[in-house]
């Protein structure tokens, strides 16, 4: 998909750059593959804000996506490519030979009419899924499981991918886009190719309203607040805050390490590249 550049015929179109979605399906999703979705507005079950600057946005239906790809050796044909308001990547509606319909993450270079299949001994081509132990070293993959049968967890956003760089003692060595190199069990499934919509990160929304349609509210800086509202607030005139970046509750942020899962530290060969913190 290409990018659409708009002429500045109105103030809000000046500088606007959006993904051209003209090749995607223009109708509604398959009703049997959708569920109701209630907007939380960034609140938890106590009604307290757990994620700031969320709320509003267009009403959505959740598309049930098959992240597990455990229907082995049954070929499926790509019926259409669809937009999904719940994620940055596009979806592919596939129809199996037995008539079952399913949504999968659409990889790059997957077209309507293509055939995809999951299994141990299948071709290495975009959209096919197989265990990491059966994938050749050097292959670009996405939708990678961390636990066998739990469904893909890594490399699911638009344009993302990981690379299989080695295999050893039942584990696969996978290099992620963050620079992290980690071990994943060879039985875990992964899909071939990179995720669709790589131009998602190159969009310029052009106006605040388009951000509101996506459910994002205005983001207020801590240094622009009063001392009662934020550790960086206050000061006569504009200040730089006077201390390292912190959350409204005083915890270090912007690069400070927060990973606490020591149980799987041994599976990380090289940590991801991080900034200062």
UniProtKB/Swiss-Prot annotation:
The organism's superkingdom is given as: Bacteria
**Entries under Gene3D superfamilies matching the protein:** 2.30.30.30, Nucleic acid-binding proteins (2.40.50.140), Ribosomal protein L2, domain 3 (4.10.950.10)
Ion transport is among the record's keywords:
no
Q: What segment(s) does the record annotate as region Disordered? A: 216-277
- Which InterPro entries does its entry note? NA-bd_OB-fold, Rib_uL2_dom2, Ribosomal_uL2, Ribosomal_uL2_bac/org-type, Ribosomal_uL2_C, Ribosomal_uL2_CS, Ribosomal_uL2_dom3, Ribosomal_uL2_RNA-bd_dom
Write down the SUPFAM superfamilies for this protein, in alphabetical order. Answer: Nucleic acid-binding proteins, Translation proteins SH3-like domain
Q: Which GO terms describe its molecular function?
A: rRNA binding; structural constituent of ribosome; transferase activity
Extract the HAMAP family matched here. Ribosomal_uL2_B
Q: Which NCBIfam families match?
A: rplB_bact
Instruction: Relate the protein's function as given in its record.
Output: One of the primary rRNA binding proteins. Required for association of the 30S and 50S subunits to form the 70S ribosome, for tRNA binding and peptide bond formation. It has been suggested to have peptidyltransferase activity; this is somewhat controversial. Makes several contacts with the 16S rRNA in the 70S ribosome.
UniProt lists the family membership as follows: Belongs to the universal ribosomal protein uL2 family.
Q: Return the protein name.
A: Large ribosomal subunit protein uL2
| Phylogenetic lineage | Bacteria, Pseudomonadati, Pseudomonadota, Alphaproteobacteria, Acetobacterales
């Amino acid at each position: 998909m290409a990018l659409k550049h708009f002429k500045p015929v109105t103030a809000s179109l000046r500088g606007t750059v959006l993904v051209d979605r003209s090749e995607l399906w223009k109708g509604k999703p398959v009703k049997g593959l959708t569920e109701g979705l209630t907007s939380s507005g960034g609140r938890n079950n106590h009604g307290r804000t757990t994620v700031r600057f969320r709320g509003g946005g267009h009403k959505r239906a959740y598309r049930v996506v098959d992240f597990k790809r455990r229907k082995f050796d049954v070929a499926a044909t790509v019926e259409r490519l669809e937009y999904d308001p719940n994620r940055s990547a596009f979806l592919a509606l596939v129809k199996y030979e037995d008539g079952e319909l399913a949504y999968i993450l659409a990889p790059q270079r997957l077209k309507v009419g293509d055939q995809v299949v999951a299994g141990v001994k299948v071709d290495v081509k975009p959209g096919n899924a197989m265990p990491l132990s059966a994938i050749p070293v050097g292959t670009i993959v996405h939708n990678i499981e961390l636990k066998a049968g739990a469904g893909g967890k890594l490399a699911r956003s638009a344009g993302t991918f990981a690379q299989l760089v080695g295999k050893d003692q039942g584990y696969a060595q996978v290099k992620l886009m963050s620079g992290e190199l980690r071990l994943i069990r060879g039985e875990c499934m992964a899909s071939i190719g990179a995720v669709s919509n790589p131009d998602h990160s190159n969009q310029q929304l052009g106006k605040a309203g388009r951000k509101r349609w996506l459910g994002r509210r205005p983001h207020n800086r801590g240094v622009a607040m009063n001392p009662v509202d934020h550790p960086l607030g206050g000061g006569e005139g504009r200040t730089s805050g006077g201390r390292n970046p912190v959350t409204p509750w005083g915890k270090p942020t912007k690069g400070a390490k927060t990973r606490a899962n020591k149980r799987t530290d041994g599976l990380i060969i090289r940590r991801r590249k991080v900034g200062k913190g």
